Amino acid sequence: MKLFIDTTQNYCNLALVNDKNQIVDSYQELTNNNMTDIVIEKIQTLLAKNKVNKSKVKAIYLLTGPGSFTGCRVGFIIAMTWASVYKVKLYIMNSLLFQTKKGTGISIIDAKSNKKFIAIYEKYNEKFSPSILPNFDVENIIKKYNNLNKYEDYMNVDFFEKLIEHLEHFQQVENPDTVEPLYLKEPIQ
């Protein structure tokens, strides 16, 4: 069994995926800034509801950001702890790539303060690395890559369809100590 965790945006997205890469069950909730209070409880509920013991989870799939600083941190700490304690495989993908269709497109996420996170991909290859830029600069980049579809702020995105679409493109982490969330900006002080 695989456990998918995404806490990078305004939603807590969790899923159990079987060995045939089919979603067994999923959970999604708008968090209202209470991410740290609900994620562990919701994972426990999802596992219990499906009669899955923690030891049956053989891999964790995690979105690493960018997005909410706290959200990125919460999912990251849970995934890293689980991978270390239960000695399971860890797979990661950034939330900008995850938002694209088949790993191709201009991916944008609002970073607040008149800035946006942006990255550009073609067939899962980075053409423009994940960055945080002023809105004006983002518009200029969009014009340069106008042949690609634009995906913004997870509008009309079904997280669980995306999970199955991208599952084989998550990157396995060999050494969890070398992984960090993809923040791209400093936390608000």
Per-range role (PLM):
Residues M1-K20, D37, Y91-Q189:
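Oxyanion-binding and handling regions
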Residues C12-N13, V17-F128:
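Nucleotide and nucleotide-moiety/phosphate-recognizing core
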